[in-house]
From Swiss-Prot:
GO biological process per UniProt: negative regulation of apoptotic process; negative regulation of cell differentiation; negative regulation of DNA-templated transcription; positive regulation of cell population proliferation; proteasome-mediated ubiquitin-dependent protein catabolic process
Repeat keyword on record: yes
Gene name of the record: PRAMEF33
Residues spanning the signal sequence: none
UniProt key word Repeat: yes
Protein name: PRAME family member 33
Domain of life, per lineage: Eukaryota
Amino acid sequence: MSLQAPSRLLELAGQSLLRNQFLTIFTLDELPREVFPLMFMEAFSMRRFEALKLMVQAWPFLRLPLGSLMKTPHLETLQAVLRGLDTLVAQKVRPRRWKLQVLDLQDVDENFWTIWSGARVLSCSPEAMSKRQTVEDCPRMGEHQPLKVFIDLCLKESTLDECLSYLFGWIHYRRGLVHLCCSKVQNYSMPTSSFRNLLERIYPDSIQELEVWKKCSLNKTGKFAPYLSQMSNLRELFLAFGYERELYVSVQWPCIPDLDSPFLCLYYPQMLYIKKISNIKEHLEHLLRYLKNPLGAFIFSDAYLADRDMECLSQYPSLSQLKELRLIHILMWTTNLQPLGALLEKVAATLKTLVLKDCRIQDPQLRVLLPALSHCSQLTTFNFHGNETSMNALKDLLRHTRGLSKLGLELYPAPLESLDYKGHVNWEILTPIRAELMRTLREVRQPKRIFFGPVPCPTCGSWPSEKVDFHLCS
């Protein structure tokens, strides 16, 4: 007999039971556990819904990874599996053989079905398989603990599809018996009120990544924010609100790209990224109030910060340990920046990246920030490009960076004296001014990578390089 014979015999036995419709809960109780995955795959492919229901009731493993088998949602299959679970969760005394703790609808574990399909069955003993299926990401439950259903949600329509609608309805009527767990929730299009109702049905501690995209308005932030306070394991919070037609692509890079690009990075944990919110005015406080854990990064782009919003930046513990602060395309020329200075003082010992880009900060406002900025000794990146400052104000700024020895990249605007009446750089004027600014800087420290003026260079398209002295492109 060949080495593949045991696997083949198990497969044939399961096929025979299915095709001759001999399958009952009693026959399943007598079958070896090795038969179940093969039989389940066979019943799944043959659309034997009654058999699926019975096998769920007798499932001998801690976890049923249905999502990796059901690549395309199929309502009748889901209904059959949930009917099988119905019989179990309603029983006070659970069947002798039942071990199922998790129904996994995530498309993440093809390994289970590959092993038991025979491709690698001989390299994995039943004992090893038992260890594999301990559901490491879910603590072992007691006899009367709720069943857990795992699924990742990506909501691209304003309403749920038929499978999700059925699943959420099924869970709603079994509160206390079933917990819906979603480690990642993405909302692209569902209205705010519907999304809040959906969040109420998800076990909040299970959410680790939450993305809310443009069609959800923040005009009712006070009603949305309390849900955040319940998400004790939340690591990534991404908010992008607005009504413009935009293209976003989520990627994972070792650093956050320039935020003018259409690429948004969700790499860093404990990051709050808010972009293009048309009506966040005086609502930012609601969000910060309910964030219990300190953020590592706070990124705010293409929006308006009212004075009250600016004041709250330094008041909440969630922003007290920032390593990265990016305020981009925010008009600040009439804003009181003393609260921002207070925030910089608070995070001076931890802040490594500071971006105040295209904020139209003017000389009086810049001077308010300088004392706090001079204390940010851990800064490695400082981007002050796109602001409206004079040459003397920039000199003052450079002198205040005396103690910032770790700065590796600095970007500054062309001073107002080098701009024409249209706001364009006059390179003949900028060149000697830039040289004078460099002399001022070298009096207090030696820079590494630094750039004055338009970024990138309008002539050659170059970005900051390793060179300290930049040539004037001809």
